[in-house]
Amino acid sequence: MKKIILLICILIGVSSCDMIAEDIQESKNYFEDKKIRKNQNKIGLELLEKNTEKILWNRMELRIPKNSKINEVNGRLEYDGQALEIEFKYIPNKNNDDICFDVSTSFKEWYKKRNNELYLMYSNNFQSTKSNMRLAEKIAKENGFIECKNGLI
Protein backbone atom coordinates (compact mmCIF):
# COMPACT_ATOMS: atom_id res chain seq x y z
CA MET A 1 0.00 0.00 0.00
CA LYS A 2 2.80 2.41 0.90
CA LYS A 3 4.58 1.70 -2.40
CA ILE A 4 1.43 2.52 -4.33
CA ILE A 5 1.02 5.78 -2.43
CA LEU A 6 4.68 6.64 -3.02
CA LEU A 7 4.29 5.97 -6.74
CA ILE A 8 1.19 8.15 -6.88
CA CYS A 9 3.04 10.90 -5.00
CA ILE A 10 5.92 10.78 -7.46
CA LEU A 11 3.52 10.98 -10.40
CA ILE A 12 1.53 13.95 -9.10
CA GLY A 13 4.26 15.81 -7.26
CA VAL A 14 5.77 15.67 -3.79
CA SER A 15 3.64 18.49 -2.35
CA SER A 16 0.50 16.40 -2.76
CA CYS A 17 1.94 13.51 -0.76
CA ASP A 18 1.03 15.12 2.57
CA MET A 19 -2.53 15.68 1.37
CA ILE A 20 -2.89 12.04 0.35
CA ALA A 21 -1.48 10.80 3.65
CA GLU A 22 -3.84 13.17 5.50
CA ASP A 23 -6.84 11.94 3.50
CA ILE A 24 -5.91 8.32 4.21
CA GLN A 25 -5.61 9.06 7.94
CA GLU A 26 -8.96 10.89 7.98
CA SER A 27 -10.54 7.94 6.20
CA LYS A 28 -9.08 5.49 8.73
CA ASN A 29 -10.35 7.65 11.62
CA TYR A 30 -13.82 7.90 10.07
CA PHE A 31 -14.16 4.14 9.67
CA GLU A 32 -12.75 3.49 13.15
CA ASP A 33 -15.31 5.92 14.64
CA LYS A 34 -18.06 4.26 12.63
CA LYS A 35 -17.01 0.84 13.94
CA ILE A 36 -16.98 2.13 17.55
CA ARG A 37 -20.43 3.75 17.19
CA LYS A 38 -21.84 0.54 15.68
CA ASN A 39 -20.50 -1.42 18.66
CA GLN A 40 -21.86 1.19 21.11
CA ASN A 41 -25.30 0.93 19.50
CA LYS A 42 -25.21 -2.88 19.65
CA ILE A 43 -24.26 -2.79 23.34
CA GLY A 44 -26.96 -0.19 24.05
CA LEU A 45 -29.60 -2.47 22.54
CA GLU A 46 -28.31 -5.37 24.61
CA LEU A 47 -28.29 -3.35 27.85
CA LEU A 48 -31.86 -2.13 27.32
CA GLU A 49 -32.96 -5.73 27.88
CA LYS A 50 -30.66 -6.48 30.83
CA ASN A 51 -31.62 -6.40 34.48
CA THR A 52 -30.24 -3.59 36.59
CA GLU A 53 -28.12 -3.61 39.71
CA LYS A 54 -27.53 -1.01 42.41
CA ILE A 55 -24.13 0.62 42.71
CA LEU A 56 -22.81 3.38 44.94
CA TRP A 57 -21.47 6.31 42.94
CA ASN A 58 -20.26 9.45 44.76
CA ARG A 59 -22.38 8.66 47.82
CA MET A 60 -25.52 8.14 45.72
CA GLU A 61 -27.16 4.81 44.99
CA LEU A 62 -27.68 4.31 41.24
CA ARG A 63 -29.42 1.60 39.25
CA ILE A 64 -27.49 0.79 36.09
CA PRO A 65 -27.50 -2.23 33.74
CA LYS A 66 -26.02 -5.34 35.30
CA ASN A 67 -22.27 -5.82 34.75
CA SER A 68 -21.78 -2.23 33.58
CA LYS A 69 -19.80 0.41 35.47
CA ILE A 70 -19.10 4.13 35.54
CA ASN A 71 -15.51 4.94 34.60
CA GLU A 72 -13.92 6.80 37.53
CA VAL A 73 -11.79 9.03 35.28
CA ASN A 74 -14.16 10.23 32.55
CA GLY A 75 -17.56 9.31 34.04
CA ARG A 76 -18.68 7.31 31.01
CA LEU A 77 -20.87 4.24 31.35
CA GLU A 78 -18.89 1.18 30.26
CA TYR A 79 -19.81 -2.36 29.44
CA ASP A 80 -17.35 -5.09 28.55
CA GLY A 81 -14.55 -2.52 28.12
CA GLN A 82 -16.53 -0.33 25.69
CA ALA A 83 -17.42 3.23 26.73
CA LEU A 84 -20.96 4.23 25.74
CA GLU A 85 -22.34 7.66 24.83
CA ILE A 86 -23.65 8.14 28.37
CA GLU A 87 -21.70 10.26 30.83
CA PHE A 88 -22.13 11.01 34.53
CA LYS A 89 -20.76 14.04 36.38
CA TYR A 90 -20.75 14.84 40.09
CA ILE A 91 -20.51 18.43 41.37
CA PRO A 92 -20.24 18.82 45.17
CA ASN A 93 -21.36 22.02 46.92
CA LYS A 94 -23.54 23.27 44.07
CA ASN A 95 -25.63 26.03 45.66
CA ASN A 96 -27.04 28.01 42.73
CA ASP A 97 -29.82 27.01 40.37
CA ASP A 98 -27.83 27.24 37.10
CA ILE A 99 -27.96 23.58 36.21
CA CYS A 100 -29.17 23.19 32.63
CA PHE A 101 -27.71 24.83 29.55
CA ASP A 102 -29.64 27.86 28.27
CA VAL A 103 -29.24 26.88 24.61
CA SER A 104 -30.04 23.78 22.60
CA THR A 105 -27.27 21.19 22.58
CA SER A 106 -26.35 18.04 20.65
CA PHE A 107 -26.92 15.96 23.79
CA LYS A 108 -29.63 15.41 26.36
CA GLU A 109 -28.96 16.42 29.93
CA TRP A 110 -30.53 15.19 33.18
CA TYR A 111 -29.86 16.23 36.77
CA LYS A 112 -30.55 15.19 40.33
CA LYS A 113 -29.92 17.42 43.36
CA ARG A 114 -29.36 15.96 46.80
CA ASN A 115 -28.40 18.22 49.71
CA ASN A 116 -25.90 20.61 48.08
CA GLU A 117 -24.65 17.99 45.65
CA LEU A 118 -25.47 17.84 41.96
CA TYR A 119 -25.46 14.69 39.85
CA LEU A 120 -25.58 15.14 36.07
CA MET A 121 -26.06 12.68 33.25
CA TYR A 122 -25.54 13.37 29.54
CA SER A 123 -26.19 11.35 26.40
CA ASN A 124 -25.07 12.34 22.91
CA ASN A 125 -27.74 12.42 20.24
CA PHE A 126 -25.79 10.61 17.52
CA GLN A 127 -27.97 9.03 14.84
CA SER A 128 -25.78 5.92 14.91
CA THR A 129 -26.13 5.35 18.68
CA LYS A 130 -29.84 5.90 19.30
CA SER A 131 -29.96 2.89 21.62
CA ASN A 132 -27.56 4.70 23.98
CA MET A 133 -30.02 7.61 24.18
CA ARG A 134 -32.90 5.23 24.96
CA LEU A 135 -30.75 3.52 27.59
CA ALA A 136 -29.88 6.91 29.15
CA GLU A 137 -33.58 7.81 29.27
CA LYS A 138 -34.30 4.51 31.02
CA ILE A 139 -31.48 5.04 33.55
CA ALA A 140 -32.64 8.61 34.21
CA LYS A 141 -36.22 7.47 34.83
CA GLU A 142 -35.21 4.58 37.13
CA ASN A 143 -32.99 6.87 39.22
CA GLY A 144 -35.26 9.91 39.48
CA PHE A 145 -33.16 12.26 37.33
CA ILE A 146 -34.96 15.32 35.95
CA GLU A 147 -34.58 16.08 32.24
CA CYS A 148 -33.34 19.54 31.25
CA LYS A 149 -35.69 21.18 28.77
CA ASN A 150 -33.11 23.13 26.77
CA GLY A 151 -33.76 20.98 23.68
CA LEU A 152 -31.62 19.16 21.17
CA ILE A 153 -30.00 20.71 18.11
Residue ranges and their predicted role:
Residues 1-21:
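Classical Sec-dependent N-terminal signal peptides that target proteins to the secretory pathway
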Residues 17-84, 90-91, 114, 124-153:
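N-terminal targeting sequences that direct proteins away from the cytosol to non-cytosolic compartments
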Residues 83-107:
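Short, Gly/Ser/Thr-enriched beta-strand-loop segments that form substrate-interacting elements
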Residues 108-115:
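A short, hydrophobic, proline-anchored segment that marks a local hinge/packing element in signaling
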